[in-house]
Amino acid sequence: MLSLDRITSLRSLLAGAALSVLCLQPSISGASPDETNPQPSDFPARKVYSPHANQNFPDRVLFGDMHLHTNLSPDAGLLGTSLTAEDAYRAARGRTVTSNSGQPFQLVRPLDFLVVTDHAEYIGLAVMIREANPILLSNPHGKWLWENFTAGGERAMAAFASIVSDGTTGNDRLGDTDMGSTIWGDFVKTADRFNEPGVFSAMTGFEWTSMPGGNNIHRVAVFADGADKTGQVLPFSLLDSQNPEDLWKYMENYERNTGGRVLSHLHNGNLSNGTAFSKTRFNGKPVDAAYAEARIRWEPIMEISQIKGDGETHPFLSPDDEFADFERWDVGNLDGSAPKKDEMLQYEYGRSALKVGLELEARLGVNPYQFGFNASSDAHTGLASTAEDNYFGKMASSEPGPNRFDGEVLRAVDPALRI
C-alpha cells in the first residue's frame, strides 16, 4: 500500500513531467493546422476493409431430386411404369397422384426442385410400343421388340435383355427412327409448364447410360434452361458414344451454341468395377491435365447415395468407420458379368476418390475429383419417394405390396452375382 507521502511525491513527479512536455510546445504550436493535423484528403479513397461486407449469402436449404425416371425410360416404361413427367412434377409439388400400382401417393413434404432424367437411349420406346407407333413398326428390330413385349413372359424378358445388351455394346439396332425428337420436345415443354421461379424448379435432364463391359459409368446431365434452349438439342446417348469425354464435348457445344448452362454427375461408382474415378482415361491412356480440367469443369458434383447403394466409402477402405457398411451394393458390376475385387474399391467411392484426386493434382496441377456431393433417388417409378414409411421402391414392381421384394429387376449375366 502507498503512503500519503509517496502519493504526494508521485503527483509532484507527474506534474513536473507534464510541465516539461508543455515547455516543448511553442515550436509546434506555431505550425499551421494543415501541417500538424491529418486531413481526409491526405488518405486516398479505398474499399471497405472486409472483402465480404454487403455480400448476400444463401440462407435457405433446398431439397429435391436430381435423378428420377418416368415412363419415357425403356427400363421403366417396359417394366410397368406408366407415370409421365407431368405426373412426376405434380407429385414433387406435393399433389396426390395415383401410383403405377393404383395406390394413392403423396410426399411427406413437397420438393423445391425436381430433375426428370430419363435414359437418352431409346427414349420413349415404351410409349411407342404401347401405342403400336407406325414409325417403330416400320423398323424391323422395332417390330420385333413390339411383338415380343406384346407377347409378354419370357419373350418380353428376351426383348428387354436385348435392349440392355445394346447398352453394353453400344450397338444401335433401331437406328434413326425419329423417336427422340418429338418426345424430347414435348418433355421440355412440360417442364416449362410446371416451373415456377422462386417456388418450384421443374428442371430437365437425361441419363447417359454408358456401361462398357457391364461397368457402370453412367452420367446424369442437368440443364439450367427452359425449352427455348433445351429444345434445340437432343439427349446425348451411349449409342452416340460410350466415351464420357464425348459427352463433355456435347455439353460444351450446347453452352456455346445456345448460351445455356449444363452440368453432369456420375452415379453408382460402386457398380463400375474400378472405372469411375480411375487414373486412366476411357481410351486406356493415363489421365492428363487436359482431361482433369475437362472433368472437373463438366462434373463438379458426384451422386454419393441412391437406391442402388451408398457411394461414400466401403469397410475395406474405412475399417475404423462404423458406418462404412451403410447400404452397400458391392457384389460386382452393373450387369452382373464380373465380380468385385478389393483393388477396385478405391476408384469407386467418393471419399477415396477425393484422395485419388489429390494424388493426381500433385502430379498434374489439376484435381479432376474436387467435387461436391448430392444424393438422389434414381427411382424408375416417376415418384421421388425415399422416406422409410412412404417408400414406393425402385421399379413399379417394388411399389408397396406383399411381394414387392420378390423377383429380379435384371437377370445377372453370372447368376452368382444376382442384381
Language-model regions, residue ranges each:
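Bacterial N-terminal signal peptides
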Residues: 13-25
